[in-house]
Amino acid sequence: MFPMVTEFMNYGQQTVRAARYIGQGFMITLSHANRLPVTIQYPYEKLITSERFRGRIHFEFDKCIACEVCVRVCPIDLPVVDWKLETDIRKKRLLNYSIDFGICIFCGNCVEYCPTNCLSMTEEYELSTYDRHELNYNQIALGRLPMSIIDDYTIRTILNLPEIKI
């Protein structure tokens, strides 16, 4: 008779423990009900990226001295720097500068080690195209300002999502 009573007590303890675990899970679910939604309507609303975000590289042609430091520090030797030596002034003159963003790993080494600060990272991350050859940006495409600076009126940036009224 005693084994039957102990089994019944164990069953009761297990039932109480299971109910407690279900209650804890339900409390976690209820705590998430008060939070703001994480999703946004992407093409029309965009979250503001952090200031350390590594997006598309912006290039200023006039500042570049064609030292090729960006090529040496790049782990995949990506930037293509074409220059010509001016013999009369004994300086390099930059002819072309290009980066293929289809291969770029956005490590930021080129920006960090550039002695003249002609390279900078922007917050632009929409680089998708249907043709991979369009991702090869030359000095003209790299010099264009990103959309966030131009201030496109059709896109609303979101710093804090609106609160839910219950």
From Swiss-Prot:
Residues binding [4Fe-4S] cluster 1: 64, 67, 70, 114
Catalytic activity: a plastoquinone + NADH + (n+1) H(+)(in) = a plastoquinol + NAD(+) + n H(+)(out); a plastoquinone + NADPH + (n+1) H(+)(in) = a plastoquinol + NADP(+) + n H(+)(out)
A Pfam family reported for this protein in Swiss-Prot or TrEMBL: Fer4
Cofactor or coenzyme needed: [4Fe-4S] cluster
GO MF term set: 4 iron, 4 sulfur cluster binding; iron ion binding; NADH dehydrogenase (ubiquinone) activity; quinone binding
KW Lipid metabolism (keyword) present: no
Key words, A-Z: 4Fe-4S, Chloroplast, Iron, Iron-sulfur, Membrane, Metal-binding, NAD, NADP, Plastid, Plastoquinone, Quinone, Repeat, Thylakoid, Translocase
Membrane topology listed for this record: Peripheral membrane protein
NCBIfam families, sorted: ndhI, NuoI, PRK05888.1-3
HAMAP family given in the database record: NDH1_NuoI
Protein's name in the database: NAD(P)H-quinone oxidoreductase subunit I, chloroplastic
Source organism of the structure: Espeletia timotensis
